[in-house]
Amino acid sequence: MKASDIMHPEDAKAIQVLRRLKGFDEIVRISMQYGYEQIYRGINLGNLVKVNAHNLPNLYLAFKNVVKRVGIKEPELYIYNDPEMNAYTYGETNPFIALSSSLVEKMTIDEVSCIIAHECGHILCKHTLYNTLLRTITELGNLFELISAATFGPILVAMYYWHRKSELSADRCAAAVVGERTYQMAMLKLACGISDIKGSPYQLVEQARAYRRFEKDSWWNRIQQNCRVTFYSHPQMVNRAWEIDRWKNSWQYKKYRESL
């Protein structure tokens, strides 16, 4: 799989804007100099459970299959105890993927593979450096109040904007690996947190149509919604579902589905 085939156009544009921001290169340099990536590796080894062929064999096999399909070097896979369904990937030189216990318990193995493929998409598209950087800046600011809105506000706004767009590229990777129908069901479970939800997996796509009508009803609705998501790390769930529902008709999606 090639990053260029799944990269969302808005992701590619946003990262170029980010790199042109004054002070951004210096932040990247400092982050690499002080090895913030090692902080997260220490957290993983100290508090999470590393998945292998012995402790969770079915999950590990599914993980290896996804990694092979995406075509990246195998990252480390961890499980952490959390009642919220979630997953993340960080690290530039030695990336890792972490899945919450709730996600593994509430989703089918195909749906978990979808989430793993999403995280592998971040690695394939080389998002992990900036993902790690964004998390580090945010956590340092929360802990030590080092970040002032005047100094880092524009950079943070730009980074969050890019991060939301990067999720769309990773979603394409997930849909290409497991199929868009499985992707839609996984997103539905992530949105509601219920493992045995019934009905069509395309419920979020239908809601997306309603949401878009809501935004178009008035300029005030559009302003409210745009301001509300400024510091969101992820696009709203209906927008993610909508984007993949559109992308499933593309030649890139069809090429990868036919080759698997």
Predicted feature residues:
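Short pre-active-site segment immediately N-terminal to the catalytic Zn-binding motif
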Residues: 50, 54, 99-114, 158-164
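Solvent-exposed, acidic/flexible segments
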Residues: 56, 109, 126-127, 163, ...
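Pan-zinc metallopeptidase signature
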Residues: 191-260
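Active-site His/Glu-centered metal-binding helix of metallohydrolases
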Residues: 107, 116-125, 169, 173
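Catalytic Zn2+-binding segment of zinc metalloproteases
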Residues: 120-139, 181
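Hydrophobic or amphipathic, alpha-helical segments that drive membrane association/targeting
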Residues: 1-93, 156-157, 195, 217-218, ...
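A structural motif
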Residues: 133-153, 160
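Short helix/loop segments within enzyme catalytic domains
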Residues: 54-58, 66, 70, 152-215
